Amino acid sequence: MANDIVLETEALSKHWGGIKALNDISLQFRDRQLHGVVGPNGAGKSTLLNMLCGSLKPTSGCIFHKGQRIDTLKPWKFVRRGIGRSFQKTNIYPEVTCLENCAISAQRRFGGNFNLFASRHSNQMVRKAAEEALAQVGLEGRTHTIAAEISYGEQRQLEIAMVLATDPCILLLDEPMAGMGHEESQRIIELLKERKQTYCIVLVEHDMDAIFELSDQLTVLDNGRHLITGTVDEVRADPRVKEAYLGAEEDDAEEQAA
């Protein structure tokens, strides 16, 4: 339904000179769905996320949030509108506690600072938001642990908690499972399965098994162009996708199983 659309791009493009990083991309992202975005390196996935969070302005085209155009706004206004972004590389403050990491993010939500000079009421709101975010990702037992001392997988969970602390309605996640082992990846998969019941999630991920398991809708980009958007089954069945991304590996597996 149209009223489920919380984020939309219309003919979105980003060019640097003659390089077309993203070209004429029109997509719709729906509430309480996980929308996967895949493609090879250089396909334009991170460029898309950078524009969806306001940190990169499009060369042409528009971005709409709940029907209102937002691509001309400052990045902090994207945050205030409930659009939260994580990054491909771990983006935490390693020298402070997990709680303080989330509090730093939560202060953007309230427009204040988590410090001794802020009002007691302001600090209480920020602390509560930080504690709730940690609990949502299963890190409530790590509240007072220095971020550098937790495992890599937990650091990725912490980064998601930092996004949740801003009180988003849309989560933009850039390869949250990068560099993880199977067990750590599975924890993130279960976390995202739960979170997509509440949020619109746009997930860029190279782990194809994870993206197939999680996605309600899946978009494939190729050299900055939109190749296909559909269900996982529709994407897997598309001959262009099989040739370009899934390729011979899936065909070989089917032949061996026959």
Task: Give the ranges of each region predicted by the language model.
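Glycine-rich phosphate-binding loops of nucleotide-dependent enzymes
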Residues: 2-258
